[in-house]
From Swiss-Prot:
It comes from Bacillus subtilis (strain 168). GO terms for molecular function: hexosyltransferase activity; UDP-glycosyltransferase activity. The keyword Lyase does not apply. This is Uncharacterized UDP-glucosyltransferase YdhE. Keywords: Glycosyltransferase, Transferase. Gene3D superfamilies: Glycogen Phosphorylase B (3.40.50.2000). Belongs to the UDP-glycosyltransferase family. The gene is ydhE. Its EC number is 2.4.1.-. The lineage of its organism: Bacteria, Bacillati, Bacillota, Bacilli, Bacillales.
Amino acid sequence: MKTVLILNFPAEGHVNPTLGITKAFSDKGYDVHYISTEKYKKRLEAAGATVHLHRDLLRTTPIHVGSPNGILDFVKIHIKTSLDILQIVKDLSKSIQFDFVYYDKFGAGELVRDYLDIPGVSSSASFLFGEEHLKILPLHPESGAPLELDQECEDLLAKMKETYGVAPKNLVQFMNNKGELNVVYTSRYFQPESDRFGDECLFIGPSFPKRAEKTDFPIEQLKDEKVIYISMGTVLDHTEDFFNLCIDAFSGFNGKVVIAAGEKADLTKLKQAPENFIIAPYVPQLEVLEQSDVFITHGGMNSVNEGIHFSVPLVVMPHDKDQPMVAQRLSELHAGYVISKDEVNAQILKQAVDEVLRNDQYTAGIKKINQSFKECMDMEEVMERIDELIRQKNK
């Protein structure tokens, strides 16, 4: 029986894509150990993992990523979390012999692989990036304005080297961990410029395990209705103005409008919505998408994949991170209509939804991507490739 150690970045868009493969490892009889935070413990245990917890600095530290200080704070969280994880790994490795480590692009993955000196498999929750995309990041040594570390960061990195004998090659490693194999939760068809990536990249498509969550959402109200579903994900702040635009745009819509407002939205700042609107902080997204005719989204990879899975055409309003790249790819494949967050108004929103509902090319484009997901490498083949890697390494 193999023993796998899984590491991840503690955010929805990173943890959720790994649930399928975590369950696959467990179902195959692997002993699965997953290092994460309290927030994700239950769902990881439901997928068959033994969970070991570290501090959730990401949720408890306010970060403004747009500012130089925000980027420094983000790096500091990575370094401190890596130290926490390395200590857990050091303790676990006294009694457990791990065969390989499976880790996210973000975080401590390569550090732990180097510390344990075992095979490493990386996991990409979004598209793969070419080197030219990484060079734009302030964390890259060749970026125009590389990030200056403060004394606290220098001291923490020195402590890492001294205590665990490992150090990042450069700061970009915290956002681009590589493995001897790289698992990608999309298809070669959807991946931009996919011919640049070799056979070490395993395109397995996204997985959609049923989430064990109870909700009082009135899903039956969506049956036999035209449905617009609107969500800006779980991370964005100050979404109230946008949701008010949606209320203006779709007050006359002949069907249901569902807004997943998120935990951060202040619902008292929203206008009085007509009766055909359902607005809630939390919405069971998979169930709602199953009934939806169009999905207005920020373009986060998780949400986009879920929309594709149910063949729901997309109106995409990207904000940051990988969202502009995802939006551009959807546009290239005629699967999404892209609108600018800086120019959006009620008229533009209404036009976008009318266009997507009226023009069949969007549904056809989405279905083509969905088909490519179904044709991805299956879990059995992924396991075989990992087994082969371990055998090679142990020769």
